Swiss-Prot record:
Single GO molecular function: structural constituent of ribosome
InterPro entries per record: Ribosomal_uL14 (IPR000218), Ribosomal_uL14_bac-type (IPR005745), Ribosomal_uL14_CS (IPR019972), Ribosomal_uL14_sf (IPR036853)
CDD domains from the UniProt entry: Ribosomal_uL14
Entry's Gene Ontology cellular component terms: cytosolic large ribosomal subunit
Source taxonomy: Bacteria, Bacillati, Cyanobacteriota, Cyanophyceae, Gomontiellales
Protein name: Large ribosomal subunit protein uL14
Organism: Cyanothece sp. (strain PCC 7425 / ATCC 29141)
Function: Binds to 23S rRNA. Forms part of two intersubunit bridges in the 70S ribosome.
Gene designation per UniProt: rplN
Length: 122
């Protein structure tokens, strides 16, 4: 469950390390975001000499949350951290690699490129 002012780790090699959520997209006054939701965030920590710099405003899709995700089968899944992958306006990832597991819900929300780059899909 990600809201305004939430910090997230970055799960790709775009150059950003930490994000601060500015806005959860979708709906007029949407308060919380979960796995598969697109957010607007600012980069709080970045690797030097990379395309993404500190204080850049970026779009990202949430790939892991500490809040448990309830599935229709009755199973729930949760992760150790809150993490996101940076995307461009078309929804394609900015990085070429994705680190750590991602949730299967991303496939349902048409982020198949991120799912294919991930080492593990839970």
């Amino acid at each position: 469950m990600i809201q305004q002012e939430s910090y997230l780790n970055v799960a790709d090699n775009s150059g950003a390390k930490k994000l601060l959520c500015i806005r959860v997209l979708g709906g007029g006054n949407r308060r919380y975001g979960s796995v598969g939701d697109v957010i607007i965030a600012t980069v709080k920590d970045a690797t030097p000499n990379m395309p993404v710099k500190k204080s850049d405003v970026v779009r990202a899709v949430i790939v892991r949350t500490r809040k448990a995700i309830r599935r229709e089968s009755g199973m729930s899944i949760r992760f150790d951290d809150n993490a996101a992958v940076l995307i461009n306006q078309d929804g394609n990832p900015k990085g070429t690699r994705v680190f750590g597991p991602v949730a299967r819900e991303l496939r349902d929300k048409n982020f198949t490129k991120i799912v294919s780059l991930a080492p593990e899909v839970l």
